[in-house]
């Protein structure tokens, strides 16, 4: 004699959804013509989408920040490279 046992609970499949990463808040933080002080973040980015120009430093996570007080200027470096610079306040007043 054989006894057949059936499931008393229905098996439930798992879903492949239900995950989401935390926001990284990337992008331009100070626009063209904005006044910045030393150390202020201009752009948060992954990789060098925008390259540092005059008076702009680059952090280890490719964040661009001001090395001098001045006005932010976005421009092009060559045919297809974007660049951001900070024009010091003394030069901006004279120009």
From Swiss-Prot:
Propeptide: 1-6
CC per GO annotation: cytosolic large ribosomal subunit
Domain of life per record: Bacteria
InterPro entries: Ribosomal_bL27 (IPR001684), Ribosomal_bL27_CS (IPR018261)
Post-translational modifications reported in the UniProt record: The N-terminus is cleaved by ribosomal processing cysteine protease Prp.
Gene Ontology terms describing biological process: translation
Keywords for this protein: Ribonucleoprotein, Ribosomal protein
Gene3D superfamilies named in the record: 2.40.50.100
PROSITE patterns, alphabetized: RIBOSOMAL_L27 (PS00831)
Single GO MF annotation: structural constituent of ribosome
Similarity comment: family membership: Belongs to the bacterial ribosomal protein bL27 family.
Name used for this protein in its record: Large ribosomal subunit protein bL27
Organism: Symbiobacterium thermophilum (strain DSM 24528 / JCM 14929 / IAM 14863 / T)
Gene this chain is encoded by: rpmA
